[in-house]
Amino acid sequence: MEVDTATFVRLHHELLCAHEGPSIISKFDAIKKVKLGTLANQSGGVNNITEAFLAKLRNFERKSEAYLASDLAERELTRDTHKAIVFVTKSVLLGGKSLKDLLPYGVIVCAFIFIPETASVLDNVPVMIGNQKRPLTVALIKYIAKSLNCDLVGDSYDTFYYCNSSAYGKNLISVSDNDFSNPQRALLSVGDLCYQAARSLHVAAANYIRIFDRMPPGFQPSKHLFRIIGVLDMETLKTMVTSNIAREPGMFCHDNVKDVLHRIGVYSPNHHFSAVILWKGWASTYAYMFNQEQLNMLSGTSGLAGDFGKYKLTYGSTFDEGVIHVQYQFVTPEVVRKRNIYPDLSALKGGGS
């Protein structure tokens, strides 16, 4: 599926800068101005500037947006020890990885900037920067840094992108100031687009709705699969809310702020789903990036209404049994038109009616 790369990058840039612009500037500023040498050399004391920006980074650390080694003042610093900024999608952390797992070698102070899940669709579009192959996602990172007047490379720090694709030999990709030519058009896989939709919904479920913080009584991660249905538009959500509440009174709770329908009570593996969530990324990203014909394909049986609309992802939980296995199934307007809203989820394979 062909997409205009400038539109794709600009859209995600606007989304990220509108919501996280000041935070991004603050992280770059803090990483730039924290002088690690003054921490190791306690005889001269820590200067006030380093103290202030170190406090900022510790505040980001409390929000799981930065990492600082616990013994900074005792470190014997070498030229191989430095600071970093790492761009990454939040879904990387949901499977159980920690921020420490994402650190570049030798880095003891790092700030993390989270990009939208759908932006990583560009991971599979390679571009050449010098003699190195890099994912086109770096174009978004460079655009963000340039528009916010942030230096990607400083005298004591570097910037990286944690890429999910294995096509570049390693996950941590360095992002330099070197210019390169963006392709005007890029071919994106329908499968990749659908997968990123599921990952985006997964992040919303975990970090915004926080649906995994309190699992229903009777749910056992080692035995059960937690099922979530994703819908693309408010009208479909309203239909499912009204229909399910009328069909099974007292069995559901609708949160109209977070746009989610919860099944309440004891968990049963026989339930077709435990929650229905509006995936807002469809309206905020895909609807702007693609024409109507492409949107019809994405929401049809060759896309989200078929095999490409069902994914199993994991959430690193505090359960003794380990991670929670979550199945995401999209119910699209096409499925609703076929009046097949309440099937066993396996019946949706291939858009079955």
From Swiss-Prot:
Zinc as UniProt keyword: no
Keywords from the named record: Host-virus interaction, Inhibition of host innate immune response by virus, Suppressor of RNA silencing, Viral immunoevasion
A GO biological-process term: symbiont-mediated suppression of host innate immune response
Annotated InterPro entries: Phytoreo_Pns
Pfam family, one: Phytoreo_Pns
Family: Belongs to the phytoreovirus non-structural protein 10 family.
Job of this protein: Suppressor of RNA-mediated gene silencing, also known as post-transcriptional gene silencing (PTGS), a mechanism of plant viral defense that limits the accumulation of viral RNAs.
Name the record gives this protein: Suppressor of RNA-mediated gene silencing
Organism whose genome encodes this protein: Rice dwarf virus (isolate Akita)
